[in-house]
Amino acid sequence: MKMPENLEMPQEWTPEQKLFPHQVGFTCPPFDFDAAPTDFLRIAPPTVGVHGWMLHVPDYQHGLDQRKRNFGMLKDFAHCMGRNGVDACGQVGSNWVHASGLGVDGIREFCEKLSDEHGLAFHMAGYAMVEALRAMNVEKIALNAVYHWPDWWQGTAGFLEEAGFDVLWAGNFVDQGWFADQSAVNEQRWIFDGDLADKSFQYVAEKAPAADAYIVNGMCNFRTGQNGQPERMLHQTPRLETMLGKPVIAHDTALYWRMFKSLSVKPQGRHGQLLESL
């Protein structure tokens, strides 16, 4: 039996060939099981489909230098997602922007270049925070650095200052007095008691009462879910905003906001001022 000469699949995805009208891809930082695809999908309408791509660095130990050395993997991620019909990509991991050494404008240009090359909207968590704060007309901020190591959160504070924001106060759980040292924080593997979310933000608010907004870096988890299941800042934000009377913006909610904006889609439910501004 003679086989057809052309067995190639079409190179472009038409709208009729996509499983979902709006298709999204997220990175997962090496040595992590990230909740972003799950959290995003849970608040998205049924027209949205989500995929994840775990960055694979076998010897990864969370070093900023490792992020810089492996920054090129984001190009592979964008190429993979673009080739498979993804409309918007989200890079999870707030430290990658400052670890890259590209600066604020360099990161913006990097995101624009990947977007243009691969026919999608490419967003990084660290730069999404800048865009979110600007959209909310925020000038003065206080950074709750939660579990972040000192060189991590200091890099984040510097990146935000370079972007033009006035960082009134910044510090992590050790600076706030909840843990004796960074090793004790690391032992928790970024999952903390549920009541620490409120206590920590109350502390930061007392340190910087003049802040226009309180921000939190990274993807911190608190045991506030059913039977103590860990939950991200997405779940904490409405309660914290009610308690503090000001916007609370995290790198997870900032990234989701930016991706929903690119998709021209609104999230379902109430998840804080930023996401409800869409």
Describe the residue ranges of each PLM region.
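N-terminal glycine-rich anion-binding loop in soluble enzyme alpha/beta folds
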Residues: 2-76, 157-192
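Periplasmic-binding protein-like
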Residues: 27, 86-93, 142-144, 211-220
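A short, acidic, amphipathic alpha-helical segment used as a generic capping/interface helix at domain edges
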Residues: 73-80, 193-208, 212, 224-238
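Glycine/small-residue-rich loop that forms an oxyanion/phosphate-binding "nest" at active or ligand-binding sites
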Residues: 78-125
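Glycine-rich phosphate/diphosphate-binding loops that line cofactor/substrate pockets in enzymes
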Residues: 82-86, 130-140, 206-210
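Short Gly/Thr/Asp-enriched flexible loops that form oxyanion-binding sites at enzyme active sites
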Residues: 99-114, 224-241
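Conserved beta-alpha
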Residues: 113-114, 118-182
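C-terminal functional extensions of proteins
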Residues: 235, 243-278
